[in-house]
Swiss-Prot record:
The protein, known as: Histidinol-phosphate aminotransferase, chloroplastic
Gene Ontology molecular function terms on file: histidinol-phosphate transaminase activity; pyridoxal phosphate binding
Source organism per UniProt: Nicotiana tabacum (Common tobacco)
List of residues that carry N6-(pyridoxal phosphate)lysine: 273
E.C. code: 2.6.1.9
Gene name tied to this protein: HPA
Compartment list: Plastid, Chloroplast
Amino acid sequence: MGVIELCNTSSICIGRAKPSCCSIERNQRRRIICMASSVPVQEESQQKQRVTGDAFIRPHLLKLSPYQPILPFEVLSTRLGRKPEDIVKLDANENPYGPPPEVIEALGAMKFPYIYPDPESRTLRAALAEDSGLESEYILAGCGADELIDLIMRCVLDPGDMIVDCPPTFTMYEFDAAVNGAHVIKVPRNPDFSLDVERIAEVVEHEKPKCIFLTSPNNPDGSIVDDETLLKILDLPILVILDEAYVEFSGMESKMKWVKKHENLIVLRTFSKRAGLAGLRVGYGAFPKSIIEFLWRAKQPYNVSVAAEVAACAALKNPTYLENVKVALVQERERLFNLLKEVPFLDPYPSYSNFILCKVTSGMDAKKLKEDLATMGVMIRHYNSKELKGYVRVSVGKPEHTEALMKCLKHFY
């Protein structure tokens, strides 16, 4: 290598151009002269200091709007001036009964929280295989189903690729697509919230999108994708991600086993609703072997925590509790639906999930209704999207939560 000779930065050094490659005789030293800036050191330093951090951010993220999450108890408590136990939280579709008692016991008896978790979540996947009837080699666990949605996109989508979204639906699909630099083709649902299969087929043929996200039951309306519709979409040359976060409440069998015969199907599940583990973030998915291999390569190695795996395994050991809670929530859903039909300014939609979507009518403002109920300590979901303007969503709670909601609603009629 040559020796670089630097000149004083306040002057300009002029040198002859030298060949980029040459031989150097033994005991000879090559003198390389370079151009130096005539800008004073202090001024150049100030210019460098003016570079802001956002200069390093990927351009497509600079205008990304953050995901709008539901506020947790501690934040709501401060804002409303109420104790957490005095807030009726019907805005996030959480399981009000919480996990089986075995979960709390297992977490208290956890022996090795200081050891990294199993990267393959083998114990959990074995338990899920027994629970679902699908072999563990088709199953991958994640830090909530949300992590798996992002992982799928990172493995499937190049910047500029397209996905199909069918609003109104879970907004995480559109958000993660934006994070990954993909474009979203929206195929709105029919007025009854069913899928527009003909339009989906046209989009797949002409736009060649990589994947489509379907939720069954769909969030926020609680409608389901029947087998005939799903098979029609699976016949298209597109990867179908079926989100079954709420399938337990639908009375339908999960499609997890279908991944063995459909190479273009992924099925996602979660412990948040069924087992009351939303706060511990543990989800899972069923994948064709031709796809799951690459997700294993790309996923974070320690994505499912020791606590999450312990809790999920403990929950699966008490299927009777899980079944009883499901039955209780389905029964309360039907009672809540009938009560909401009696409210003169609400038009509820039948639901296969643990929530009910209502159209706000009779001149009542949906956003103000949500805000007024919040001041009374009852939280429901309101939407800003054009597809759901004038709608609210109510999660199914315990019977006493329903009573509190109905008591507050009576203030308006």
